[in-house]
């Protein structure tokens, strides 16, 4: 388990102090994939560097598997860092070394014999899908292949924790999905704890179990991914979710919808099994409503599906609308009134 207790990171400059991380508390379960999402300057990259002590916190404790990182001796800290590996946005490969020799590099530093290092590297080459490219140089690889080398190198010392700092930000969408699938596979096979820093909610949705949203150095919202997508609380979180679901039904569009006195435009949010149920059919049959679908989308998460549906319909009175709303919410479909005639 990884625990962050009241973590603060402050930088002093000539003009002012910069509070990069502001009293953050987090608990990350062993064997889980935990995402931290935020816009540029939110403090997320600083936060991840505190986990392996590349940055030292101004105050607070980082505890990994029972060890308080800031209290370890230099030799114990070096050993701990071997078990907390990291991959980066721009790969950080050694351009004068082949794929195989990039992977053996941390093993050489750790004093592993050349034969064992080569054997372990060959196994990792196969694991990340680069068999046949062992003798290639980074300049001969695509972006996705470079990141696969970075992942293999990070796994060389058999870590228990893998930190991913914007690891897919430089990749195209298809390659991003391939790298995410690889991380899922590695996590399952090696029982890794993975912490992912990103500004892409798509990444969070695809593979994370839990997510923390950061703004101005603070964690402003956190929880299970499905819960955060279903019911985001903070405006920043709502923006991330809206962008990922391609929900562009804003007030300017809703103004184009002509409504009579008894008309409603509502947004229905659903997750899990509800995302694949014939909801419109249910509404028309159960509540005898003529439904006009204005917008809809469904996306897939690691644990199921999430989505929204924006519809227009007319009801005779407010009591019937409340009956409709209560019925759907009893089935775990949230109902939000966008506009009322």
UniProtKB/Swiss-Prot annotation:
Family: Belongs to the ABC transporter superfamily. Methionine importer (TC 3.A.1.24) family.
Topology versus the membrane: Peripheral membrane protein
Catalytic reaction annotation: L-methionine(out) + ATP + H2O = L-methionine(in) + ADP + phosphate + H(+); D-methionine(out) + ATP + H2O = D-methionine(in) + ADP + phosphate + H(+)
Positions contributing to ATP binding: 38-45
CDD domains per UniProt: ABC_MetN_methionine_transporter
Source species: Staphylococcus saprophyticus subsp. saprophyticus (strain ATCC 15305 / DSM 20229 / NCIMB 8711 / NCTC 7292 / S-41)
Residue ranges occupied by any ABC transporter domain in the UniProt entry: 2-241
Enzyme Commission number(s) from the entry: 7.4.2.11
Record keyword Transmembrane present: no
Any one cellular-component term (Gene Ontology): plasma membrane
Name by which UniProt lists this protein: Methionine import ATP-binding protein MetN
Quaternary structure annotation from Swiss-Prot or TrEMBL: The complex is composed of two ATP-binding proteins (MetN), two transmembrane proteins (MetI) and a solute-binding protein (MetQ).
InterPro entries referenced in this protein's UniProt entry, alphabetically: AAA+_ATPase (IPR003593), ABC_transporter-like_ATP-bd (IPR003439), ABC_transporter-like_CS (IPR017871), ACT-like_dom_sf (IPR045865), MetN_ABC (IPR041701), MetN_ABC_transporter-like (IPR050086), NIL_domain (IPR018449), P-loop_NTPase (IPR027417)
Molecular function terms from GO: ABC-type D-methionine transporter activity; ATP binding; ATP hydrolysis activity
Cellular location(s): Cell membrane
UniProt keyword annotation of Transport present: yes
Function of the protein: Part of the ABC transporter complex MetNIQ involved in methionine import. Responsible for energy coupling to the transport system.
């Amino acid at each position: 388990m990884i625990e962050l207790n009241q973590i603060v990171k402050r930088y002093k400059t000539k003009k002012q102090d910069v509070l990069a991380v502001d009293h953050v508390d987090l608990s990350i379960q062993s064997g889980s994939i935990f995402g931290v999402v935020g816009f540029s300057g939110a403090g997320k990259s600083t936060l991840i560097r505190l986990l392996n002590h590349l940055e030292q916190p101004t105050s607070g404790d980082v505890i990994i598997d029972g060890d308080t990182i800031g209290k370890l001796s230099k030799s114990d800290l070096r050993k701990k860092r071997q078990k907390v590996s990291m991959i980066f946005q721009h790969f950080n490969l050694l351009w004068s070394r082949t794929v195989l020799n990039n992977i053996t590099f941390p093993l050489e530093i750790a004093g592993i014999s050349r034969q064992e290092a080569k054997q372990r590297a060959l196994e990792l080459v196969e694991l990340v899908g680069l068999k046949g490219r062992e003798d290639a140089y980074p300049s001969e690889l695509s972006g996705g292949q470079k990141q696969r080398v970075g992942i293999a190198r990070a796994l060389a010392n058999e870590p228990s924790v893998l930190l991913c700092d914007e690891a897919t930000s430089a990749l195209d969408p298809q390659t991003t999905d391939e790298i995410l699938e690889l991380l899922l596979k590695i996590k399952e096979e090696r029982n890794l704890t993975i912490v992912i820093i990103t500004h892409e909610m798509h990444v969070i949705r695809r593979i994370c179990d839990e997510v923390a949203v950061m703004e101005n150095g603070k964690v402003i919202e956190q929880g299970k991914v499905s819960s955060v997508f279903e019911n985001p609380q903070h405006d920043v979180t709502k923006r991330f979710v809206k962008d990922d679901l391609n929900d562009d039904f804003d007030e300017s569009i809703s103004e184009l919808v002509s409504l009579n006195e008894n008309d409603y435009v509502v947004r229905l949010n659903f997750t899990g099994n509800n995302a694949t149920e014939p909801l419109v059919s249910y509404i028309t049959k159960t509540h005898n409503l003529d439904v006009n679908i204005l917008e809809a989308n469904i996306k897939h998460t690691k644990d199921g599906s999430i989505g929204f549906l924006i519809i227009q319909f007319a009801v005779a009175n407010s009591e019937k609308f409340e009956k409709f709303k209560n019925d759907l919410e009893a089935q775990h479909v949230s109902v939000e009134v966008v506009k009322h005639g």
